[in-house]
A protein has these predicted regions:
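Extracytoplasmic/periplasmic solute-binding protein
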Residues: 1-22
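Glycine-centered hinge/linker elements that transmit conformational signals in sensory
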Residues: 16-47, 96
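Extracytoplasmic/periplasmic substrate-recognition and gating elements
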Residues: 39-42, 82-149
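Short helix-initiation/N-cap motifs at beta->coil->alpha
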Residues: 45-60
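Beta->alpha turn/N-cap motifs
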Residues: 52, 69-74, 112-114
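Alpha-to-beta junction loops
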Residues: 61-70
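A ligand-binding cleft/hinge motif common to bilobed small-molecule-binding domains
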Residues: 71-86
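C-terminal capping/gating helix-and-loop segments adjacent to ligand/active sites or protein-protein/ligand interfaces
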Residues: 155-158, 171-227
Protein backbone atom coordinates (compact mmCIF):
# COMPACT_ATOMS: atom_id res chain seq x y z
CA UNK A 1 0.00 0.00 0.00
CA UNK A 2 2.72 2.44 0.97
CA UNK A 3 4.76 1.89 -2.19
CA UNK A 4 1.67 2.33 -4.39
CA UNK A 5 1.17 5.82 -2.95
CA UNK A 6 4.53 6.78 -4.43
CA UNK A 7 4.50 4.77 -7.67
CA UNK A 8 2.45 1.91 -9.12
CA UNK A 9 5.65 0.21 -10.27
CA UNK A 10 8.08 0.91 -7.38
CA UNK A 11 7.66 -2.45 -5.68
CA UNK A 12 8.17 -4.48 -8.86
CA UNK A 13 11.09 -2.31 -9.95
CA UNK A 14 12.85 -3.13 -6.69
CA UNK A 15 12.16 -6.86 -6.71
CA UNK A 16 13.15 -7.07 -10.39
CA UNK A 17 16.48 -5.37 -9.67
CA UNK A 18 15.65 -2.31 -11.76
CA UNK A 19 15.79 -0.06 -8.71
CA UNK A 20 17.57 -0.53 -5.39
CA UNK A 21 15.66 -1.35 -2.23
CA UNK A 22 17.81 1.39 -0.71
CA UNK A 23 16.45 4.01 -3.12
CA UNK A 24 15.01 7.21 -1.70
CA UNK A 25 11.52 6.23 -2.91
CA UNK A 26 11.56 2.89 -1.11
CA UNK A 27 12.94 4.47 2.05
CA UNK A 28 10.10 6.99 1.89
CA UNK A 29 7.60 4.13 1.65
CA UNK A 30 9.21 2.39 4.62
CA UNK A 31 9.19 5.60 6.65
CA UNK A 32 5.48 6.00 5.97
CA UNK A 33 4.86 2.36 6.84
CA UNK A 34 6.50 2.86 10.23
CA UNK A 35 4.51 6.06 10.71
CA UNK A 36 1.27 4.07 10.62
CA UNK A 37 2.44 2.23 13.73
CA UNK A 38 4.07 5.21 15.43
CA UNK A 39 0.88 7.25 15.04
CA UNK A 40 -1.37 4.46 16.30
CA UNK A 41 -3.18 3.85 13.01
CA UNK A 42 -2.03 0.23 13.20
CA UNK A 43 -2.75 -1.41 16.54
CA UNK A 44 0.01 -2.95 18.62
CA UNK A 45 0.31 -6.62 17.78
CA UNK A 46 -1.06 -6.24 14.27
CA UNK A 47 1.99 -7.97 12.81
CA UNK A 48 1.53 -11.06 14.97
CA UNK A 49 0.60 -14.44 13.53
CA UNK A 50 -2.89 -14.16 15.04
CA UNK A 51 -3.65 -10.66 13.79
CA UNK A 52 -5.97 -11.90 11.03
CA UNK A 53 -8.28 -14.01 13.17
CA UNK A 54 -8.11 -11.70 16.17
CA UNK A 55 -8.66 -8.60 14.04
CA UNK A 56 -11.79 -9.87 12.35
CA UNK A 57 -13.22 -11.06 15.65
CA UNK A 58 -12.67 -7.64 17.24
CA UNK A 59 -14.08 -5.88 14.18
CA UNK A 60 -17.28 -7.91 14.16
CA UNK A 61 -17.65 -7.38 17.90
CA UNK A 62 -17.49 -3.62 17.39
CA UNK A 63 -14.16 -3.34 19.21
CA UNK A 64 -12.08 -2.28 16.20
CA UNK A 65 -12.86 0.62 13.91
CA UNK A 66 -11.43 -0.94 10.76
CA UNK A 67 -9.43 -3.92 9.59
CA UNK A 68 -6.98 -4.53 6.77
CA UNK A 69 -8.49 -7.14 4.45
CA UNK A 70 -9.30 -7.76 0.80
CA UNK A 71 -12.27 -7.93 -1.52
CA UNK A 72 -12.71 -11.59 -0.58
CA UNK A 73 -14.01 -10.54 2.84
CA UNK A 74 -17.46 -10.25 1.23
CA UNK A 75 -17.64 -14.07 1.28
CA UNK A 76 -18.32 -13.75 5.02
CA UNK A 77 -21.88 -12.77 4.11
CA UNK A 78 -22.55 -16.10 2.37
CA UNK A 79 -22.13 -18.21 5.52
CA UNK A 80 -25.12 -20.04 6.95
CA UNK A 81 -24.78 -18.77 10.51
CA UNK A 82 -23.43 -15.21 10.66
CA UNK A 83 -23.38 -12.43 13.22
CA UNK A 84 -25.80 -9.51 13.05
CA UNK A 85 -22.92 -7.26 11.95
CA UNK A 86 -22.38 -9.45 8.88
CA UNK A 87 -26.07 -10.01 8.16
CA UNK A 88 -26.75 -6.26 8.16
CA UNK A 89 -23.54 -5.45 6.24
CA UNK A 90 -23.50 -1.80 7.24
CA UNK A 91 -19.85 -1.14 6.43
CA UNK A 92 -17.74 -0.66 3.31
CA UNK A 93 -14.13 -0.64 2.14
CA UNK A 94 -11.80 2.26 1.37
CA UNK A 95 -8.24 2.74 0.16
CA UNK A 96 -5.59 4.07 2.53
CA UNK A 97 -5.49 7.87 2.14
CA UNK A 98 -2.19 9.52 1.25
CA UNK A 99 0.06 9.39 4.30
CA UNK A 100 1.79 12.66 3.43
CA UNK A 101 1.32 15.61 1.11
CA UNK A 102 2.29 15.00 -2.50
CA UNK A 103 1.38 11.31 -2.53
CA UNK A 104 -1.65 9.50 -3.94
CA UNK A 105 -4.17 7.35 -2.11
CA UNK A 106 -3.23 3.67 -2.11
CA UNK A 107 -4.19 1.68 -5.19
CA UNK A 108 -5.97 -1.65 -5.43
CA UNK A 109 -3.31 -4.31 -4.89
CA UNK A 110 -3.44 -8.05 -5.40
CA UNK A 111 -2.61 -10.90 -7.71
CA UNK A 112 -3.74 -14.23 -9.12
CA UNK A 113 -4.77 -16.74 -6.45
CA UNK A 114 -5.82 -19.67 -8.63
CA UNK A 115 -4.87 -20.78 -12.12
CA UNK A 116 -5.87 -23.92 -14.01
CA UNK A 117 -4.02 -26.00 -16.56
CA UNK A 118 -4.02 -29.42 -18.22
CA UNK A 119 -1.01 -31.70 -17.86
CA UNK A 120 0.56 -33.38 -20.87
CA UNK A 121 -0.24 -36.83 -19.49
CA UNK A 122 -3.88 -36.04 -18.70
CA UNK A 123 -5.96 -39.15 -19.46
CA UNK A 124 -9.00 -37.20 -20.64
CA UNK A 125 -7.99 -33.70 -21.79
CA UNK A 126 -11.41 -33.10 -23.33
CA UNK A 127 -13.14 -33.58 -19.97
CA UNK A 128 -10.47 -31.49 -18.25
CA UNK A 129 -10.99 -28.68 -20.73
CA UNK A 130 -14.74 -28.86 -20.18
CA UNK A 131 -14.22 -28.47 -16.43
CA UNK A 132 -11.81 -25.56 -16.86
CA UNK A 133 -14.22 -23.82 -19.24
CA UNK A 134 -16.95 -24.12 -16.63
CA UNK A 135 -14.69 -22.77 -13.88
CA UNK A 136 -13.58 -19.85 -16.06
CA UNK A 137 -16.76 -18.69 -17.76
CA UNK A 138 -19.62 -21.15 -17.25
CA UNK A 139 -21.73 -22.59 -14.45
CA UNK A 140 -18.68 -23.11 -12.27
CA UNK A 141 -17.71 -19.47 -12.67
CA UNK A 142 -21.19 -18.41 -11.61
CA UNK A 143 -20.90 -20.51 -8.45
CA UNK A 144 -17.54 -18.88 -7.72
CA UNK A 145 -19.11 -15.45 -8.14
CA UNK A 146 -22.02 -16.37 -5.87
CA UNK A 147 -19.56 -17.31 -3.13
CA UNK A 148 -18.07 -13.77 -3.31
CA UNK A 149 -14.60 -15.03 -2.51
CA UNK A 150 -12.60 -14.57 -5.70
CA UNK A 151 -13.02 -12.18 -8.58
CA UNK A 152 -13.03 -13.90 -11.96
CA UNK A 153 -10.69 -12.97 -14.79
CA UNK A 154 -13.57 -13.42 -17.23
CA UNK A 155 -15.61 -10.19 -17.23
CA UNK A 156 -19.28 -9.51 -16.51
CA UNK A 157 -20.03 -12.48 -14.25
CA UNK A 158 -21.54 -11.15 -11.04
CA UNK A 159 -23.21 -12.82 -8.03
CA UNK A 160 -26.79 -13.93 -8.65
CA UNK A 161 -28.76 -12.54 -5.70
CA UNK A 162 -31.72 -14.75 -6.64
CA UNK A 163 -29.96 -17.89 -5.38
CA UNK A 164 -28.09 -16.38 -2.44
CA UNK A 165 -29.02 -16.23 1.24
CA UNK A 166 -31.38 -13.29 1.58
CA UNK A 167 -30.65 -11.05 4.52
CA UNK A 168 -30.98 -7.34 5.13
CA UNK A 169 -27.48 -6.58 3.88
CA UNK A 170 -27.54 -8.74 0.73
CA UNK A 171 -27.58 -5.97 -1.85
CA UNK A 172 -24.99 -3.92 0.05
CA UNK A 173 -22.61 -6.89 0.21
CA UNK A 174 -23.07 -7.72 -3.48
CA UNK A 175 -22.69 -4.09 -4.56
CA UNK A 176 -19.46 -3.82 -2.58
CA UNK A 177 -18.09 -7.02 -4.10
CA UNK A 178 -18.99 -5.92 -7.63
CA UNK A 179 -17.47 -2.49 -7.12
CA UNK A 180 -14.20 -3.94 -5.88
CA UNK A 181 -14.13 -6.15 -8.97
CA UNK A 182 -14.39 -3.10 -11.20
CA UNK A 183 -11.58 -1.45 -9.22
CA UNK A 184 -9.38 -4.48 -9.83
CA UNK A 185 -10.25 -4.63 -13.53
CA UNK A 186 -9.34 -0.95 -13.90
CA UNK A 187 -5.77 -1.63 -12.82
CA UNK A 188 -4.14 -3.71 -10.12
CA UNK A 189 -0.79 -3.10 -8.41
CA UNK A 190 1.10 -6.37 -7.94
CA UNK A 191 1.45 -7.63 -4.37
CA UNK A 192 3.33 -10.85 -5.12
CA UNK A 193 7.04 -11.36 -4.45
CA UNK A 194 8.44 -13.82 -6.97
CA UNK A 195 11.54 -14.85 -4.99
CA UNK A 196 11.03 -16.55 -1.61
CA UNK A 197 14.33 -15.23 -0.26
CA UNK A 198 13.25 -11.66 -0.91
CA UNK A 199 9.82 -12.27 0.59
CA UNK A 200 11.45 -13.47 3.82
CA UNK A 201 13.84 -10.52 3.83
CA UNK A 202 10.97 -8.05 3.39
CA UNK A 203 9.05 -9.65 6.25
CA UNK A 204 12.11 -9.54 8.51
CA UNK A 205 12.85 -5.94 7.58
CA UNK A 206 9.31 -4.72 8.22
CA UNK A 207 9.08 -6.58 11.53
CA UNK A 208 12.43 -5.15 12.57
CA UNK A 209 11.51 -1.66 11.46
CA UNK A 210 8.28 -1.57 13.45
CA UNK A 211 9.83 -3.36 16.43
CA UNK A 212 12.77 -0.97 16.65
CA UNK A 213 15.44 -3.48 15.65
CA UNK A 214 16.12 -1.72 12.34
CA UNK A 215 16.23 1.88 11.26
CA UNK A 216 14.77 2.69 7.85
CA UNK A 217 18.26 2.58 6.33
CA UNK A 218 19.03 -0.76 7.98
CA UNK A 219 15.71 -2.29 6.94
CA UNK A 220 16.24 -1.25 3.33
CA UNK A 221 19.81 -2.55 3.38
CA UNK A 222 18.66 -5.89 4.83
CA UNK A 223 16.46 -6.48 1.79
CA UNK A 224 19.12 -5.20 -0.61
CA UNK A 225 21.69 -7.59 0.86
CA UNK A 226 19.30 -10.50 0.23
CA UNK A 227 18.76 -9.29 -3.34
CA UNK A 228 22.49 -8.93 -3.99
CA UNK A 229 23.13 -12.46 -2.72
CA UNK A 230 20.89 -14.06 -5.35
Amino acid sequence: MCTSQISDTLFDECQNGEKAWTSDEMKQAMTNYKKLFDDGVMQDGSLSSTSYSDGTTLFLAGQAGMMLLGSWWAQEYTGEDVSDAVANWDYDYFYLPAIEDGLSDSKAIGGVDFGYGITKNCKDPEAAWKAISSFAAGEGAQEIANDMNNHLSYPNIEPDTGVMVEREGLQSAVDEFNRSGKDIAAGLVNQRISEATIETAVQEAMQGLVGGTYSVDEAAQHIQDAQDAL
